[in-house]
């Protein structure tokens, strides 16, 4: 029987949440520079709210969201940190449409 403290970082649950957040916020949108701050905040807020509803109080979560216009140029992104690989976790989700890219990363650090 696992306790709340023993719960692992479950990538599949987190991915479902961030995919939903992106679809809700960006579905049927066209890139507009002035809207990016609202879109990123909406995605982050929705993700954190749903992640907190998982009731896994043994983690602190960090959510990062990048939205940028498709211009034909390539891009590369990477994240790195020093942590306990046995207990901490992370996942990322990449979404795109005809006018923009969106990359969301979630880090779960066990307390």
UniProtKB/Swiss-Prot annotation:
Pfam families: Tctex-1. This is Dynein light chain Tctex-type. It is found in: Cytoplasm, Cytoskeleton. One of its GO terms (biological process) is microtubule-based movement. One of its GO terms (cellular component) is cytoplasm. The gene is dlcA. Keywords: Cytoplasm, Cytoskeleton, Dynein, Microtubule, Motor protein. Acts as a non-catalytic accessory component of a dynein complex. Belongs to the dynein light chain Tctex-type family. It comes from Dictyostelium discoideum. Its main location: cytoplasm. It comes from the Eukaryota.
């Amino acid at each position: 029987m696992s306790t709340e403290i023993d719960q692992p970082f479950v990538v599949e649950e987190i991915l479902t949440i961030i995919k939903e957040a992106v679809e809700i916020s960006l579905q049927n949108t066209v890139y507009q520079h002035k809207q990016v701050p609202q879109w990123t905040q909406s995605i982050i807020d929705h993700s954190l709210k749903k992640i907190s509803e998982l009731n896994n109080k043994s983690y602190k979560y960090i959510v990062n969201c990048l939205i940028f216009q498709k211009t034909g140029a390539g891009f590369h992104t990477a994240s790195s940190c020093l942590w306990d690989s046995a207990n901490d976790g992370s996942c990322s989700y990449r979404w795109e449409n005809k006018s923009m890219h969106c990359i969301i990363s979630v880090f779960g650090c066990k307390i």
